[in-house]
Amino acid sequence: MSGNNSPINAQLFPDARDVTKDALQTFVELPECTYMKGLGSSQQAEVMACDCKPGPTACDEDSGCINRLTSIECVRCCKGCQNKRFQGKKYASVDVISTEKKGFGLRATKDIAAGEFVYEYVGEVIDEPTFKERTAIYTTQGVKHFYFMMLQKGEFIDATAKGGLGRFCNHSCAPNGHVEKWVVGKRLRMGIFASRHIQRGEEVTFDYNVDRYGAEAQACYCGEKNCVGFLGGKTQTESASKVSGTLTAALGLTSRDINAILRGKKSAEDLRPRDLTVQDVSKVMASLMMNQEAWQVNLMLQRIALCTDTSVQAAVMKMHGYQIFAQILTATWGDNPLGLDDSDRVNVTLMLLRVLQKWPRITKNKISSSQIENVVKSLTSNDNSDIATIAQELLSEWANLKMAFRIPRRKIDPDGDEHSVSRGTSEEVTKESSKSEEPNDVEVVKVNKKADNNGNGVTDSPSTRSESPFTFIPTPYSNKTAPKGPKKAVKQPASPMVPPRSLPKGWQFANDPQGKVYYYNLELNIQQWDFPKASRASSPSTPKGPKGPKGPRGNRRDERRDNSETREPLSLQSQRESDLQRIIEQARLQEVKNNSEPAPSASAKPVNAQAHRLTKLLAKVVPNQVSKYDVDRERAKKCSKDIVQILVDKELKRPEPMTEISDEKAKKIKEFVKGYMGKVVKRLEEKEGGAKDFGRGRQGNRRDSERQSDRRGRQGQSDRDHSDNHGRKRKGEENQPYEAGPMYDDESAETSTETVKKPKVDMEIDLE
């Protein structure tokens, strides 16, 4: 039974005395399993890594971690990884009690959620001959309770003399827990997990009949209504299936069919499993990693081979497909633990190779890390011509692939700009520009070339980023003069805002689309939000009469200035002139637009009311999603505000805005927040590494130096103010709230594209 609530007839023992200390005297406690030489191997060539990003929720149950989904614990993972329960001994709160007929039992001292890790089954991992010897010894000694658990074929965990508290977990015919086998590093380990919600005071149990012990049958005292009366022994296959719930789902058969196979009434070859779905992929891949029986492996591989859905095949590849297939091929033609005959080995190998042919070949990363090339290479000399031919074809195709290299992560800068986020980030860059990224190595956000953060027409090409930054001027939602509704629904005031005092010489002002004033200097080719400060050269001063003739020093200064201007490349001059003309034209068009727009009418009020309602509705969902990311409180509040406003604007454009958040829309909102916050976190990580001008090399620095030198020659002291303003801007635009990305200037946009071609990121999302 599964669900959030325990059944009404749950057996509770709230008043039973805690006898943990007494129970610990009956055996030697081990912190972890001990292994006989050569036992407990997970058959993994190397430790498998996931592609989760660092953060407080990394690799948790909602992260989609490929390791967690396939019952693999992360080993070399990021800080904050939530998938290290065996390694961290993150056990549930339990104690030991004394039962009436079953001896000691394990009791929950706090509520345990469904799926939660309860305890590891710790003991001595022994081989089959040792298992038989100890069984005889324990029988001679009159041991009433056996503590054998099968780890994998031919290997057992014996917790009789040495073990952990998990040994006291009793059998039940209606258990609230179950056993799972997990890969931890290069070892296979076993843990007890909650199958449903377990109440405080309830005994933790699981079904012993799922795992073979080889002991004599014993009477069952579980007290459940469906109790079969005994456990263990040779007759256990007749009382219950020995296949776990995870393996049942992986096989794609009904429990009735599985029982028929176990009893020999049906053959697995005569049954057709269900079509493989994306939801079952993780169970199939997790089960394939364990050394199952031959008929089980055949059924699971058959489900994969018969599947024609590309999304399912992509999921199989993502869930460590190359590594698991390499493991199966190695075992099939090596020690052959499955006991396959020659015909079965050929069939299994052909199935695997033909599946590998279906998979998209983008980069060589997963192929190389799985070491499957060496395995396939050994098959090129196989006696079966079909196997040899397909193996050679795969090797030839893989040889043409390129490796992709991950850009090192940068630490978060606590003093960095909280609103400036890279417009496009790339986790990996291939050696060849013609090769695209591997879809399963990096989470890719789909691109919409026609949409910016507000749904307006903007492209993210280098030419766009080098245009006037007015295109990306953000609007702080906290500004009282900003409109409360969407830009197109509520008209801006007809009269633009004006600066409160006179501007310094050379400075002009204009209004952005929201009516907010910004300042620009055509001569210096800069623009900013802050009111410009007057430089000494432009400050008014008392006339002191006509200037006298220049001396030799003044003439030399003029000559240097003239030479500096002559040395300036024509391309830079033409680019500057083009930028100035563009700035002037945009400012003129914006001023005409503001003057031509009528004042807000009464018809805007319903839109404002609608926007207010949507804001309240979305504010109940968005902050909870944002809080999952590792950002400070103020930054989280600001990002939540921005995201809510963006989503409100989008909803108001629809004929019928939503009145409530359905499960489907909640899922899409979650994806939107994930993409938005991913950019925020990535930008913060880059700033932590001190890369304030990403991709600017020596050539870019020399170009900056030449420009600054030329400006000093032409403008003297006034350039210091310009450099100061420009420096503040390049540092992070502290006054600029985040919308679509950083406010790129000409130089940063130009140099950033020289090193890395960043993917375009679409912040547009369809909530319908």
Curated annotation (Swiss-Prot):
SET domain residues: 92-209
Domain notes: The AWS and SET domains are necessary for transcription repression.
Function of the molecule: Histone methyltransferase that trimethylates histone H3 'Lys-36' forming H3K36me3. Involved in transcription elongation as well as in transcription repression.
UniProt-recorded name of the protein: Histone-lysine N-methyltransferase, H3 lysine-36 specific
Annotated WW domain residues: 501-534
Cross-referenced SUPFAM superfamilies: Conserved domain common to transcription factors TFIIS, elongin A, CRSP70, SET domain, WW domain
Biased composition annotated in UniProt, kind: Polar residues: 453-469
Keywords attached to this entry: Chromosome, Methyltransferase, Nucleus, Repressor, S-adenosyl-L-methionine, Transcription, Transcription regulation, Transferase
Positions with biased composition (Basic and acidic residues): 411-452, 555-568, 682-734, 755-768
MF terms in GO: histone H3K36 methyltransferase activity; histone H3K36 trimethyltransferase activity; RNA binding
Name of the encoding gene: set-2
Keyword Protein biosynthesis listed: no
Top-level division of the source organism's lineage: Eukaryota
SS bond list: none
Residues annotated as domain Post-SET: 216-232
Principal subcellular localization: nucleus
Record family assignment: Belongs to the class V-like SAM-binding methyltransferase superfamily. Histone-lysine methyltransferase family. SET2 subfamily.
AWS domain: residues covered: 45-90
Pfam family, one: WW
Enzyme class: transferase
Cellular component terms (Gene Ontology): chromatin; cytosol; nucleus
Reaction equation(s) it catalyzes: L-lysyl(36)-[histone H3] + 3 S-adenosyl-L-methionine = N(6),N(6),N(6)-trimethyl-L-lysyl(36)-[histone H3] + 3 S-adenosyl-L-homocysteine + 3 H(+)
The protein's Enzyme Commission number: 2.1.1.359
